[in-house]
Amino acid sequence: MSSLEISSSCFNQETKLPLSLPLVEGSTFEPPGKDMNEVEEKSKDIIKFTSEKLSVDEVSQLVISPLCGAISLFVGTTRNNFEGKKVISLEYEAYLPMAENEIRKICSDMRQKWPVRHIAVFHRLGLVPVTEASVIIAVSSAHRAASLEAVSYAIDALKARVPIWKKEIYEESSSSWKRNKECFWATSD
């Protein structure tokens, strides 16, 4: 008897699961080993800065857990306009040691406020063309309320605390560095 397989890989480990399991009439399926309620899984915080294009699928796969019924995502993309000017791309720079440290603190804050399992924060550096993602935040939790609230907190905290700078590049060959209005440590002009 042949069965279809679904293949999933994460951290260079591949797992194959049968699409459906054959059952004898009157029998029930019980997974081998531990009861599903006894599954132990270490929580993880995954932080990445890259000049490569970001993938929503890749980031969301990193936070999947058999203990979770919810994954919430925030995807920030480059829009094509600002105050009547046509934007062709954004350019991001960061002070990486401090940026990573601040994001780790944000992850810790999230864990104190909500019962979340896994957190992934990916941020693009360099040029980000219109419609492409500049930031993806994914959070998994047992229930949706925690992951939705946590992901909203994460993007607000990231914009307020993390040293990442954005330059808007306009169609008419001009550009402008932008300050996050939420950023607590930036001085006002």
UniProtKB/Swiss-Prot annotation:
Catalytic subunit of the molybdopterin synthase complex, a complex that catalyzes the conversion of precursor Z into molybdopterin. Acts by mediating the incorporation of 2 sulfur atoms from thiocarboxylated MOCS2A into precursor Z to generate a dithiolene group. It is found in: Cytoplasm, Cytosol. Its main location: cytoplasm. It catalyses: 2 [molybdopterin-synthase sulfur-carrier protein]-C-terminal-Gly-aminoethanethioate + cyclic pyranopterin phosphate + H2O = molybdopterin + 2 [molybdopterin-synthase sulfur-carrier protein]-C-terminal Gly-Gly + 2 H(+). Keywords: Cytoplasm, Molybdenum cofactor biosynthesis, Phosphoprotein, Transferase. Pathway: Cofactor biosynthesis; molybdopterin biosynthesis. The gene is MOCS2. This is Molybdopterin synthase catalytic subunit. This protein is produced by a bicistronic gene which also produces the small subunit (MOCS2A) from an overlapping reading frame. Heterotetramer; composed of 2 small (MOCS2A) and 2 large (MOCS2B) subunits. The keyword Protein transport does not apply. It comes from Bos taurus (Bovine).
